[in-house]
């Protein structure tokens, strides 16, 4: 799934793919289905997505990902 119907912002396949990869990697890290589904809630604008960024050691590029969330989730 590359496009989430809950996202009402600009459709950008590259951004969706990048955000989706964070949730996929986070799921692979913890192997808990709830992590995968919760990470995608509210078009990635949630605390689990932020925690996944931290857990995947993406702290230095958090702003880039949050900007992507804002673009697709308006």
From Swiss-Prot:
Pfam families: Crust_neurohorm (PF01147). The modification Valine amide is found at residue 72. GO terms for cellular component: extracellular region. GO terms for molecular function: neuropeptide hormone activity. PANTHER family: ION TRANSPORT PEPTIDE, ISOFORM C. Belongs to the arthropod CHH/MIH/GIH/VIH hormone family. This is Molt-inhibiting hormone. It comes from Procambarus bouvieri (Mexican crayfish).
């Amino acid at each position: 799934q590359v496009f989430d119907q809950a996202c009402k912002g600009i459709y950008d396949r590259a951004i969706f793919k990048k955000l989706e990869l964070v949730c996929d990697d986070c799921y692979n890290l913890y192997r808990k289905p709830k992590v995968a589904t919760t990470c995608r809630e509210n078009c990635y604008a949630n605390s689990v997505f932020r925690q996944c960024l931290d857990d995947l050691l993406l702290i230095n590029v958090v702003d880039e990902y949050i900007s992507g969330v804002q673009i697709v989730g308006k």
